[in-house]
A protein has these predicted regions:
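Basic/polar N-terminal segments that are highly enriched at the extreme N-terminus
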Residues: 1-2, 71
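C-terminal structural segments of small proteins and small subunits
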Residues: 51-71
Length: 71
């Protein structure tokens, strides 16, 4: 088996629908520019509240992807 290295970044996704959607938004957006995504770990869930109402669900995630050196 070949040796591999993975980079881990932190992202915050937001949604007006749910925490699950917020996490998915973060992963999907990252997938638009990063390749070989591997594992997303939810670090923190919180809410943006205004006037006693939930405005946004927020999910802070750690996302790993395979590190490849430039040629």
């Amino acid at each position: 088996m070949a040796e591999s290295v993975y980079k881990i970044i932190e992202l915050v996704g937001t949604s007006t629908e749910s925490w699950e959607k917020a996490a998915a938004v973060a992963v999907e957006r990252a997938g638009g520019t990063l390749r070989d995504l591997r594992i997303a770990e939810v670090e923190k869930l919180d809410l943006h509240v205004e006037n006693g109402k939930v405005m946004q669900y927020r999910a802070k995630i750690k996302l790993s992807f395979k590190y490849e050196e430039a040629d």
